Amino acid sequence: VAYIPAGSGNDFARGAGLPKNPKKALQLILAAQSPDKVHIMAYEEKISEKKGIAVNNFGIGLDAAIVHATNHSSTKERLNKYNLGSFSYLFSILRTLFTQKGFPILVDAGGKQLSFSNAFLCTATKHPFFGGGIAIAPTADASKPVIDFVMVERINIFKIIWLILLLMQKKQLKSKYFHHYTTNRLRIVSTTPQYGQEDGEDVAPRPFDLQFSTKNQLFFK
């Protein structure tokens, strides 16, 4: 498999250390003598009995609601014409910050049982980035056979602004409202219907019972 970045986000290119310029990416692919091993996520959603893979992240809650708002935004296509697609994402963030409510989740991170009553953002990721370059999990490494799980609690707007400032400095791990775990197996259960997103593709609101593991994929790069 080979990957040529062509969208407005290109988080996989960032996370896998690929050029964001399509021509440079193609040149590397054509010059490659053999493929490299990249660890990606395999998942199974027990309620819908759906199985699949994700190379970026799978989220429920805030990030998924933002993806839904962005993908269905009337301004996204116009902004993309001028290479300003990231602004569409920013507008969706500002709107969704005020409308997304907290929800309960149960988590099993490699045998460690966790319970959160007021989750806001809940994401399993294979590399640091989402949303077009936001380092939500700055220590994540796509070359390792592990999954990074990030959960942010629902807090008031002033604390959210402070957390965003920490996020911009990659210091969000200092916040007690930001939870980060690294594991080789992960289960997330949300009984309250929420939007989902799988590699930037929105999933209609539903309860989730997600199980994640890693698998190898060979990439020419």
Give the location of each predicted region.
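Short glycine-/acidic-enriched loop or helix-start segments at secondary-structure transitions
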Residues: 12-15, 65, 133-134, 161, ...
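ATP/nucleoside-binding phosphotransfer catalytic cores, i.e., glycine-rich phosphate-binding loops
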Residues: 109-111, 116, 135, 141-221
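Short, hydrophobic/aliphatic alpha-helical segments
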Residues: 43-47, 117-119, 186-188
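Catalytic core of DAGKc-family lipid kinases
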Residues: 2-114
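Glycine-rich phosphate/pyrophosphate-binding beta-alpha loops
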Residues: 121-136, 202
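Short, catalytically relevant binding-site loops at active-site mouths
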Residues: 62, 128-130, 156
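AMP-binding/adenylate-forming core of the ANL superfamily
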Residues: 53-55, 119-124
